Design a protein with these regions (language model features):
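FAD/FMN-dependent oxidoreductases across multiple families
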Residues: 93, 110, 189-266
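Glycine-rich FAD pyrophosphate-binding loop
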Residues: 1-15
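Hydrophobic "anchor" residues on beta-strands that sit immediately upstream
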Residues: 1-2, 110, 116, 235
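C-terminal helical "tail/cap" subdomain of flavin- and related membrane-associated enzymes
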Residues: 264-331
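A short coil-to-beta-strand element that immediately follows conserved catalytic motifs
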Residues: 85, 137-142, 207-219, 277
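Conserved N-terminal helical subregion
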Residues: 37-38, 44-129, 136-140
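A short alpha-helix-loop-beta-strand transition element characteristic
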Residues: 9-11, 27-43, 134-139, 273, ...
Length: 331
């Protein structure tokens, strides 16, 4: 296995960092060393008021990680297991010659392989090139930031704010010594976010100030219908496969899950136990896509009528528990 990395990882890779502890089931090694915070309570608010708190129950809590620590940890595990790594490998061409894939970098370097896994995120050009993924890509406009102190955000508590962001929500996830701040809007590919305006309203309620935030805006590719995720010797995983949850913007769990399922399918295929990789698409549809179909429907209603959604949805006695179950991977 050879990992082709376009950029040398920056010291910080800021994202929400939330994922269900159920992801541990896909790894033969413990992930706890890179978990910054274990969430036991989720707080919901409407314009910083009308707050509702839900307790996470069950055996799979919600974990918060620093993305840079997670990436580095998983890369180290892969290298220790015998993977090779090529850095600053900016892929400009992928083509198949006979039964061998040829991958070419901007600087002229070439790699040949029996199979290719496309894992280069929401801006990946390759799904269109190989006619994989949804016919119409759906993007959420998002902002991810970090404040290097915790303010008054309580330990083990994640915050979801539904009133300040048009057609979306904002969040605050605690780390050991910081807070991951974010927001997203989900209904229209052309939607933009008034980041500064929202931060000025949201951060003071957390005991934080806008001058303390370091972050960036980006487009996040979200699930937009069942689609083919594999070709002959080629697979899409993670954001490149449009697997991000269209309701709560959860991206880490489907990225890790799809990586696990891709590896399993490739192993059977390379060993000659199966003739194609079609089982990968079917497995992702069954284990993730069917839930995302419901997530898309909920998103379309909730974010189009957010105040009614908050009153009739989040404030219903059973709703916080349901959202907590989604976050912990039980639904």
């Amino acid at each position: 296995v050879c990992i082709l990395e376009k950029n040398i990882s920056s010291p910080e890779r800021i994202c929400g960092g939330g994922m269900s502890a159920a992801v541990q089931n896909w790894f033969p090694f413990k992930l706890q060393p890179i978990v910054d915070e274990v969430i036991t309570n989720v707080e919901f608010s409407w314009c910083n008021t009308d707050k509702v708190v839900a307790e996470l129950s069950g055996s799979s809590p919600f974990w918060i990680v620093k993305r840079e620590k997670l990436d580095s940890f998983l890369l180290d595990q892969a290298l220790n297991a015998g993977c090779n790594l090529l850095t600053t490998f900016n892929v400009v061409n992928i083509k198949k010659i006979s039964n061998v894939w040829q991958i070419t970098a901007l600087d002229g370097r070439q790699v040949e392989a029996k199979a290719v896994v496309i894992a280069d995120g929401s801006q990946s050009p390759w799904p269109k090139t190989f006619n994989l993924g949804p016919n119409q890509q759906k993007f959420a406009s998002t902002y991810s930031g970090r404040v290097k102190r915790k303010g008054n955000l309580r330990d083990e508590t994640a915050r979801f704010e539904f009133g300040l962001v048009k057609n979306g929500f904002a969040w605050a996830f605690p780390l050991k010594d910081a807070v991951n701040i974010g927001m997203g809007t989900f209904l229209d590919n052309k939607n933009s976010i008034s980041v500064e305006e929202i931060l000025k309203s949201f951060l003071p309620d957390l005991g934080l100030d806008t001058s303390e935030v370091i972050g960036e805006e980006k487009k996040l590719r979200v699930w937009n219908g069942h689609s083919k995720l594999n070709g002959e010797g080629i697979l899409l995983v993670g954001d490149a496969a449009s697997l991000c949850d269209p309701f709560l913007a959860e991206g880490l769990r489907p990225a890790l899950m799809s990586g696990f399922e891709a590896a399993k399918c490739l192993l059977y295929w390379l060993d000659g136990e199966v003739n194609d990789l079609d089982s990968y698409t079917k497995t992702i549809q069954k284990n993730w896509g069917n839930s995302m179909a419901w997530g898309k429907r909920i998103s379309q209603v909730f974010y189009r009528f957010p105040k009614a959604g908050y009153q009739l949805g989040v404030k219903r006695p059973t709703a916080p528990k349901r959202i907590a179950q989604i976050l912990s991977g039980e639904m």
